[in-house]
Amino acid sequence: MGGLNQGGSEVLLMRQGTIQRATIGGYFQLRLSSPYSVPLFNPRDYLTKPHEYNQYIQDNIDLLCGDAMLELQSNAISTLANNQIPGTNTWVAIINWLNDFIQPIEKDYDMVFLDANPSFSMYTQIAIATSTKMVLPVMADDSSRRAIQNAFSLVYGLKLPSEIYSKYAFAEKLKEVDMPLPKVYMILKNRLTQYMGAASAYATVLQEIDKDVLSLLKTYTDMFAFKTLDMGIID
């Protein structure tokens, strides 16, 4: 869109100011008034052609812009997902919002990329439930190691602190309605580590991440789209 130095912020504000608010927040705003049934809408009203604002981006790429308004919508979305309505699985209806958006236009695209917040908010769950594959980026620090561990707990329900949580786990809810979980497709080590020596403490952390992933790969092979570490971990 142009980035910080090329007017990207102004372009985003302009897209947010359209009648339909051409962002993910604009689409979710539409769904807040029709959370459990798909309203009549045209997904393309919410899409942006980045090439029109940045000539270096290919013209075959469409973008559904991000929106800080998601944070304001988050509580409302969670409340709607937890409502108890006879004959309606409210959680599934909400979790399919992005599927509802993509379905009318999916034949026009070869691939859809979803950039999700690292938190496990309801809108992140919507993105994950829509995905078939996950790419997990990591930095060379302990917080990234914990983040990988948390991702497997939150998404796949592994190593939960108590069986009490299993009933409410994301993976269990998808399983109940026969919705598949995305597979871990790739783990990307941040390129900043290229300047760090192999003997550094940073390298040790990355090696520990490798060990954690290898252990999971051996035990839960069906959760991964790769069979060996060198196929799935990118330095």
Regions found by a protein language model. Give the residues of each.
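P-loop NTP-binding core
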Residues: 1-235
